[in-house]
Amino acid sequence: MIRILPSMKQLSLYNDQLMPALGLGTWKSQKGEVYTAIRQAIAIGYRHFDCAPIYGNEKEIGTALHDALLAGDVTRKELWITSKVWNTHHRAEDVIVALKRTLADVQLGYLDLYLIHWPAAHLKTVKIPKTKEDLISLQQLPLEETWQGMEECVLAGLTRHIGVSNFSTKKIKGIQASAKIKIAVNQVEAHPYFQQKELLAYCQQQHIALTAYAPLGAYERASLMPNHSLPFLSDSPIIQRIADQHDATVAQVLLAWGIQRGTAVIPKSTNPDRLLQNYQAADLSLSTEDMDMLARLDSGYRYERGSYITLEGSPYTAKNLWDE
């Protein structure tokens, strides 16, 4: 019997505003599938949707949101819509231009959260860098300038909150030193193989919510890894054992773990059954023993390396991009 959660767990932001702890990611959601997935997700109970112009599907998402609002399936106030400024629009005056384009595509008057997608910039004419000449260093275009553009978006009423993505503690501190508006959220890769414990602790200390992307792992990237000897998270006997004990799926355990440790999670799916299963993960409660077992899986195993940013000759290296 399908049981829809009466209410979704929420994360409290620095200003006491609430963000749903489980959302729907839309990266790699194909055109033609996104519309149906968004409508189905809203019917299930999802209210948090994570978008970005580089994903290439914001217009279709906008159509789905428009139709859901028109049909009375949900109100705008109930929704939490996140998008991101791409690396081509990091100059202060370009940030608001990019946001206005996103708002037109998603057919909304404002976002709930707008993020700097990456702590790296490249030429406006280059969507994905191919050579070192396509990139702009942080010395040429500091993140502090981009943050000023983000703040202008808040002052213009185009987004309620602003934040960052793929930022280290060091880069967060750099923004904080001159920020007039606080960082609300840092969105980073996080799962049992890559738990980001120190970053999470710093964010929580600073009242910055952490959103985990790739909370189920990122299998499509595993073949690109120099060492991918670890089993997929879905094949981990430890996680499977915990799932069996709770009569749950492995994905539900992974999502429940993320929520229970105080992060938001944004799994991607366009499959109706998985949409429901993922949503119901927010109702799963793991024991202290479960959480301890999952904590021991931390391997420092990052799937997303930002390889197109750290290409040969780039001003960005794996070391200075991630500050590791």
Regions found by a protein language model. Give the residues of each.
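N-terminal binding-site loop/beta-alpha segment at the start of enzyme catalytic domains
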Residues: 2-79, 96, 216-219, 318-324
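Acidic (Asp/Glu)-rich catalytic clusters
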Residues: 14, 62-76, 103-107, 176-179, ...
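Active-site mouth loops of central-metabolism enzymes
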Residues: 20-32, 84-93, 135-139
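Short, acidic/polar
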Residues: 29-42, 91-106, 145, 168-172
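Short acidic/polar active-site loop segments enriched in Thr and Asp
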Residues: 47, 109-112, 160, 184
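A short, structured active-site edge motif that brings together acidic residues
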Residues: 75-89, 113-119, 187-190
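CE4/NodB-like, metal-dependent polysaccharide N-deacetylase domain
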Residues: 95-116, 152-156
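Beta/alpha (TIM)-barrel catalytic core signal, keyed to glycine-rich beta->alpha loops juxtaposed to Asp/Glu
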Residues: 119-324
